[in-house]
Amino acid sequence: MSDILDRIIAVKREEVRAAEQSAPLEELRLEASSRDLRDFVGALRAKHAAGLAAVIAEVKKASPSKGVLREHFVPAEIARSYEKHGAACLSVLTDVQFFKGSVAYLEQARAACNLPVLRKDFIVDPYQIVEARAMGADAILLIAAALETSQMQDLEALAHSLGLAVLVEVHDRDELMEALTLKTPLIGINNRNLRTFETSIETTIGMLEAIPDDRIVVTESGILSRVDVERLRAMDVHTFLVGEAFMRADEPGVELARMFF
C-alpha cells in the first residue's frame, strides 16, 4: 500500500468512529430503507447494447496529486450536463479531506438527474456502505489495495444485500486475482501507479486477457483524449470512468460528448 493510501485509510477509520457517534447504524439503516435505487450495472449494459461507450462521469472538485481541478463547482449543474451529453452513470467524490468532496455533492448531483450514482470514497468499514445507501448512492467502490480479500468479500455481501452495485478497483495483476474472487461483474482497472502517480492506459490493456468475458472492465484514470478512447474500444473496453478531463473543461458534458460520441 502506498504512503498516501495508508494516510487516507487511517483518516477513514477515524471518520467512521466519529460518524457512528453522531448517526448510529440503526438510524442509518432506517434512512437507507426509504431511498429509491437506480440500476447502475443495467445503465452500463444498456449503453453497451446500443453499441455505445458507457461513461461513468465523475463529479470531482480536487485530487491530492493535482489540487483543485474546477473552481466553478456546482454538482447539480455538472450532473445535468453529463446526463444531457450521454453519460451512463455518475461517480461523486464524498471524501472531504483529500478530494474536497462531500455527501451533499452526491445528494445534489443525484437529485438533479436520473442517472445511477457511485459513491467514490475509501470504504474500509461496513458502516460506510449503509451510509452510502442512506445518502442515495446506487453503487460503491472497493479498492483492492486498501482491503484484504476477506474484507472485500464481506463488504461486497453487505452492499449487495442493500441493493448496491460494487465496483472493485485494482492496480495490478495480484489485486486483479483477488478481485476476481468477488461476485460483482464490475472490475475497475486504475491506470494510475500508486507510487509515482503517473498514468498509462497500458495498465488496462496489459490485464485484459486475464479477465473473464462475463466481467465488465471499467478503465479508470489517465483517459484524456479521443485517441485514448478509440485505442481502448479497439481492445474491446467499452466502460470508462473519467473525471479530470471533464472537470478541466468549460462544459464537462460537452467534453464528454467530444471524447466519446
Curated annotation (Swiss-Prot):
> Per the database entry, which stretches of residues form a coiled coil?
none
Catalyzed reactions: 1-(2-carboxyphenylamino)-1-deoxy-D-ribulose 5-phosphate + H(+) = (1S,2R)-1-C-(indol-3-yl)glycerol 3-phosphate + CO2 + H2O
Name the keywords, alphabetized. Amino-acid biosynthesis, Aromatic amino acid biosynthesis, Decarboxylase, Lyase, Tryptophan biosynthesis
First-level EC class: lyase
Task: Please state the pathway this protein functions in, per its UniProt record.
Answer: Amino-acid biosynthesis; L-tryptophan biosynthesis; L-tryptophan from chorismate: step 4/5
Q: Which GO terms describe its molecular function?
A: indole-3-glycerol-phosphate synthase activity; phosphoribosylanthranilate isomerase activity
User: Which Gene Ontology BP terms does the record give?
Assistant: L-tryptophan biosynthetic process
Xref: Pfam families: IGPS
EC number(s) on file: 4.1.1.48
| Record-linked PROSITE patterns | IGPS
- What family is this protein classified in? Belongs to the TrpC family.
UniProt cross-references to NCBIfam families, sorted A to Z: PRK00278.1-6, PRK00278.2-4
Name of the featured protein? Indole-3-glycerol phosphate synthase
Tell me the lineage of the source organism: Bacteria, Pseudomonadati, Pseudomonadota, Betaproteobacteria, Burkholderiales
Name the gene for this chain.
trpC
